[in-house]
UniProtKB/Swiss-Prot annotation:
The active site is at R220, E228, R262. A lipid is attached at C10 (S-palmitoyl cysteine). It comes from Oryza sativa subsp. japonica (Rice). It is a lipid-anchor. This is Probable staphylococcal-like nuclease CAN1. Its EC number is 3.1.31.-.
Amino acid sequence: MGNSIYRFLCGLCSPSPEYQPHGAHPAVAALGRDIQQFEATSQVPDGLSRHVVSSKKAQANWYKKLIVTWKKARPTPRTPEEAARLVVTTLKNHQKADVEGFLVFYGLPIPNAAASTPAPHTAHVPKPQGCKFELHTLPVDAKAVADGDTITVYIDTADPRESGNVPREIQKAAAERTRARAARDYQKADGLQKMIADAGYRQVPNARGEEVLAKKYRIRLRGIDAPESAMPYGKEAKEALLKMVQGKSLKVYVYDEDRYGRCVGDIYCDGVFVQEQMLKKGCAWHYTAYDQRPELAKWEKQAQSGRKGLWAASRPQKPWEWRRDKRNGTA
């Protein structure tokens, strides 16, 4: 009898390759270890209840399901993203606050429904020459457009570019805020929202209206300079940009970062090159000091010839000269 107990206890202490495969991320190994532990003892981990809203009886039901799906998984999850997808698929019919809290407990990323479903295969399209990285945004909010050449966008943290970089405390705060809002504890939710925002994140709606955690980026449209808000045609330029992008998901090719910490990039909306439209409508100048692309000069010339937008004025002032005069006190 004593030997049997000894072998049983040793079995609990020894990690099984089935649950903790070689090379697994520490967060994945922790989840695998707890699933193995539950199979042997029927005990859920201490501390999980602080992250979820359901009872320990319900939690035990989750681990029963995870035992089955974990054993069937081929290959066994090794990365946080793989483990998160398995958890979301296994617990898809459970409360969102529970699923997110479970993921936060293990330090796993919180994917949305779209991210948990494999995307259809598409041909690889190389990035333009000089492009450092590419962003795919969530739908743009009306307040995101500062003027005719600057826009704030948000990237879902389930995106492969972001998923491994979200601080664990921000994942935890987002899950806690979701639960606080569900419980109508708006004071707590507002405090957590400030913490999330201070770290450069925000919970925003995705294309299906589901609130997801997202990373904030400020984008400066590459190659154009729109009139400042206080300049003639400044408000019209802002409205033109807003009309194009509001409620739309954008593709952004980022080439550089300016001195204000903004990403300098080309923006596409439904396949349309946004800077091209801004120039053709006479809503911006070609910013030749920073971008000499001939097509930008051509589109600006077309607007000038047609006296469109800001070119309807006899002598429109260049935004960079207006800013210089303002700095010098001569504006």
